[in-house]
């Protein structure tokens, strides 16, 4: 594998000098040769510097890097998250074929289907009004309380599928900052509000602090006995849930082989199911399952997650591009970049290999983005003319849900196509100067101004095109990126499924709380922390 990486690196200088405009001019088939599809989902990577030779090397890299072998280990329930001694089976949650999936010799599918059925029954009860609040009124608002994977996925997907909402209004609280829950509680009435507390252990500080605030909100307005009518939980800590006052019939579990950032397919998706209904939630799972099958069965050169991961590895570890921009041209996907940020950076932001040695080269990139066209008026300047090359990944649906606003969607499409073309083509000095002189600027001034209007071009982008942002399409898109992260993680030779980097700060925060409360001295901490504690204490009222 290292030899192939070195071969790829030897092509890097030539690749960086590649004139994509010339490549398209010389090859009328470039688009068809460097794009792949899964049903209506098209992935165009022709505007990257990948050519036939590089693609062959990347395929060889996947083969010799053991990606296919590791893929089958994941799907078959092997313990690939070895630092936590866990299988990695979020794919079982959307296994619509019901083919047995074994963990320690036991088929997990009966339990998966039982939880899914219980979720559906509960969601239908809330949606229909059969499950009422303590005063007999139907639930009109559902507030999900969680953080990280218990929040980002449901928030993103619920917003993305807004056209399919026909249930109660959905709200989300994550931040321990009291302003977050305070602002949400102003929008609802206690007698018609249901809270879902999502915490596997029921000990997550942010979640349980907000849950206690929510409990006080209900108890103060409706009495202690009302709590059981206004809460549900997604957790495996039944004793703690019962102590909180939540009926066991309203508790939905999941398993230690489901990582938080991969948990939207599990009971963590309950607020989404309540919003869009069990049938549409099933279609969401169907879309992901279709990608799972494609990932396992399609040859590498036709395999969307494989190719996306290979190109991502090439950009990060060969061309050494430090970031990637996620740019969905769909306002309802406005939280998708943040969702992928956690998925990618928490998975592949590692500095140690599976052998316990330092990573050679780079691991995962910084992932960020905003929906188009908003980003065009914010940070695209740097993507087009900055000194760093930032690979861009565009997403656009051919059809929107507002036929009366068709012209606006056509404007959206024209913008995303223009951005990918502009990044590829750029604008030369001669073209910039001619544009100025054609407008009447004299030659000398045009020579001075033109450099500021030059675009180097050759800036890589991938574009995804699909029919419409349905539950099926969203499930497919999420699973595509999940498997992309997996492919890159295997090639980085890291464990993509733990997150020890989250722990140290949490441990230190626990120790600092008594200091902030004034119960202990800050003397044992560094001078900066002592100074900050003193400054905050002085300002506190």
Swiss-Prot record:
EC assignment: 5.3.1.9
A GO molecular-function descriptor: carbohydrate derivative binding
Family matches, as SUPFAM superfamilies: SIS domain
Broad enzyme group: isomerase
Localization terms from the record: Cytoplasm
Active site location: 346 (proton donor), 377, 506
Predominant cellular place of this UniProt entry's protein: cytoplasm
Membership in a protein family: Belongs to the GPI family.
HAMAP family: G6P_isomerase
Protein name: Glucose-6-phosphate isomerase
Species classification: Bacteria, Pseudomonadati, Pseudomonadota, Alphaproteobacteria, Hyphomicrobiales
């Amino acid at each position: 594998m290292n030899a192939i990486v070195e071969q790829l690196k030897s092509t890097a200088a030539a690749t960086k000098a590649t004139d994509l405009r010339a490549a398209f001019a010389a090859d009328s088939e470039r688009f068809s040769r460097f794009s792949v599809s899964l049903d209506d989902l098209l992935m165009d990577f022709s505007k990257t510097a990948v050519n036939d030779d590089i693609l062959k090397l990347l395929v060889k890299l996947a083969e010799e890097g053991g990606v296919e072998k590791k893929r089958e280990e994941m799907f078959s329930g092997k313990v690939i998250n070895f630092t936590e001694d866990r299988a990695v089976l979020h794919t079982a949650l959307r296994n619509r074929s019901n083919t047995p999936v074994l963990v320690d010799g036991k088929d997990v599918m009966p339990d998966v289907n039982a939880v899914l059925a219980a979720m559906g029954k509960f969601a239908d009860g809330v949606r229909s009004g059969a499950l009422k609040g303590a005063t007999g009124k139907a639930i009109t608002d559902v507030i999900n309380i969680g953080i990280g994977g218990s929040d980002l996925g449901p928030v993103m997907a619920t917003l993305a599928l807004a056209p399919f909402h026909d249930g109660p209004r959905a709200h989300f609280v994550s931040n321990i900052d009291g302003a977050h829950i305070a602002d949400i509680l102003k929008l609802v009435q206690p007698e018609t509000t249901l809270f879902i507390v999502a915490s596997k252990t029921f000990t997550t500080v942010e979640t349980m602090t907000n849950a206690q605030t929510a409990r006080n909100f209900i108890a103060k307005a409706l009495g202690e006995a009302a709590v059981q009518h206004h809460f549900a939980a997604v957790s495996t800590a039944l004793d703690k849930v019962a102590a909180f006052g939540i009926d066991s019939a309203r508790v939905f579990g999941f398993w230690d082989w489901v990582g938080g950032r991969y948990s939207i397919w599990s009971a963590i998706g309950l607020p989404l199911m309540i919003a869009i209904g069990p049938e549409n939630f099933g279609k969401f799972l169907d879309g992901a399952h279709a990608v799972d099958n494609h990932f396992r069965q399609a040859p590498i050169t036709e395999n969307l997650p494989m190719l996306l991961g290979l190109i991502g590895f090439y950009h990060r570890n060969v061309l050494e591009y430090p970031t990637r921009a996620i740019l969905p041209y769909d306002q309802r996907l406005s939280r998708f970049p943040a969702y992928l940020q956690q998925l990618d950076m928490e998975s592949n932001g590692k500095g140690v290999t599976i052998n316990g040695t330092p990573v050679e080269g780079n691991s995962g990139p910084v992932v960020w983005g905003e929906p188009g066209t908003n980003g065009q008026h914010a940070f695209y300047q740097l993507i087009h003319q900055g000194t760093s090359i930032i690979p861009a990944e565009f997403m656009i649906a051919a059809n929107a849900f507002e036929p009366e606003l068709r012209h606006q969607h056509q404007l959206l499409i024209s913008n995303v196509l223009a951005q990918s073309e502009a990044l590829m083509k750029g604008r030369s000095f001669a073209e910039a100067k001619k544009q100025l002189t054609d407008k009447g600027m004299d030659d000398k001034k045009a020579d001075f101004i033109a450099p500021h209007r030059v675009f180097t071009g050759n800036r890589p982008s991938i574009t995804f095109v699909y029919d419409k942002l349905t539950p099926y399409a969203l499930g497919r898109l999420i699973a595509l990126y999940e498997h992309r992260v997996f492919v890159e993680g295997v090639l980085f030779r890291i464990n993509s499924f733990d997150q020890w980097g989250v722990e140290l700060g949490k441990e230190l925060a626990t120790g600092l709380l008594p200091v902030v409360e004034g119960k202990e001295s800050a003397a044992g901490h560094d001078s900066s922390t002592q100074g900050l504690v003193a400054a905050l204490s002085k300002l506190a009222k």
